[in-house]
Amino acid sequence: MIWLMAALAAAAGAPAPELVQCRMMECSWSRPVSNVAIRSTAAGTLRKVTALKGTSTYRDDPPSGFDRSIPIEWEKPAAVQYVLCSRSRPALAFRSGKRWIAHALDLFDLPGYHIASAIGYLRACHGVDYGREDIDQAMRDLGYRPGTRSGQVEIARPEVQMFDLPRSERE
């Protein structure tokens, strides 16, 4: 009985899952575990973000946010991402299998495969929801401008390479 009360108390203090995006009858969810600054320079602050990742399905209309009635399947262990909070070089790196993939983000002109990274970036760096109606103005108010580098590249050590991402062959 004591372990049940402890588990309920821990769950009550945990942040609510955040909706990342929904597509093709499936939604991606994230539940933050930690968000720690690990290095700062004049170019920006590198953050190590740990979160549980999950998925749910829907039939008709996707949910607009978390509701306790939504069954979410959570992956284990928690996923780690590196986020370079920078007005001039915003970027996010995530693990894909055994590789690290980094997305350099032009937050005003995102290809579809960068949207989840932009959502994670804005939440990690500013606590801002990318889905808000005035997102372009909100990003300008935060100091971002259109036209920053946009691309995807494979890297080996995100904690080192995020400040100077190599160029991809397509850039």
Task: Annotate each language-model stretch with its function.
Residues M1-A11:
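Sec-dependent N-terminal signal peptides
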